[in-house]
Amino acid sequence: SNIVLTAGAGQRMKVPARNRVEVRFPARTLSAGTARFQVGAVSGLWADAAQFELSVYTPATTEAFAVYGTVDDGALAQPVIAPTKVYTQFGGLEISTSSTALQALTDAVLYLTAYKFECSEQLASRILAIAALRDVLSAFNAPGLPPEKDLVAAVERDIAKLQGMQNSDGGFPIWRKGRESWPFHTIHVAHALVRAQEKGFAVPDEMLAAALNYLRRIESHYPKSYSADVRNTLTAYSLYVRALLDDRDLDRARRLVGEVGVENFRMDALGWLLAVLAPSSTPEGPQIQRFLANRVVETAGMANFTTGYREEDGYLLLASNRRTDGIILDALLAVEPQSDLIPKLVRGLLAHRTAGRWGNTQENVFILLALDRYFNTYEAQTPEFVARVWLGEQYVAEYTFVGRTTEYRTTVIPMSYLAQKAGAQ
């Protein structure tokens, strides 16, 4: 069983006296599992028989190829050619469709809302997360989250805590009012306040104005120990937040690019500067876009950027590769929303989650901010459509999407069917 003898099931031969002959029967298996044999031999008046079985394993090597794309309307044609010289019992064409690229972001928000430490950066990150995903989570009715009124109350409580921590210079310390104001923490808190205000949360005007004044003088607040790389990155972040506050300093952004050179910035800084420069007609914006396009690591389905920083600078910037991807994704959505890199960056970020979230507060916040912009750019309209799949003239599947869901719909066409036709299908 589970075997086909391709040259017949019987043979006749002569066996010399006191000798032996090897008899071979060409065969092929039907499927993985077990192949069972019964063998009989007859010579004159004598006969004998035996029974045995052999394990049949899947092929030792496999190969997969994926193509990803986005369809807004109309149809998409993708030629398919079945590979030759393969085991048709294995593999096939798998087609997956979804009405959204955002897959269950609840865990990332829960991680931030339940975070047990409350320094100024962590409070700001919690505000940013809730503000950023307010539209997305309400649209998808995300399970597991506290009621919206509890999340709103948490943001209001965190804003009040931060207001109580703000120093007289407008800056924010790490833990307690009266301690040294830290440039990064101050920029990050100001970022949280403006994002919260954009989403309809109440932010004290005097609190935001004092933080903005600190940002305008940010370079005078850098300790002498800060490296040039740290200073340039923090200045870029402050310019980005000022732009969100309608205080865009285009001249300083251009001078910064001219002083440092595009190739000498950290990727994070380039993402922030791109968002500041792109609305203008200055040449620096396209220069940054070209540089980023030449530094992306791209596969058929995903994309990411890699960056590095000195270990001694890490705690001053709280940097990571995933955060960099989120920052650049947000910038590309703002300046080049039709870029083919955007859906790839989204898939790459979603694929790098562990237990539904990213590695730390900074990664979660900047990625969630970018995904919020992605949602409002590409998925603001509630899905209501039918997706149909054809292979050549053969109807394959139909998927109906009504309302928001993060589910995938998948159909598999076996290799045995694909191999029946040569050439493109």
Describe each model-derived feature in a short phrase.
Residues E22-R24, S31-D229, T235-R254, W272-A275, ...:
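Extended, solvent-exposed functional surface patches
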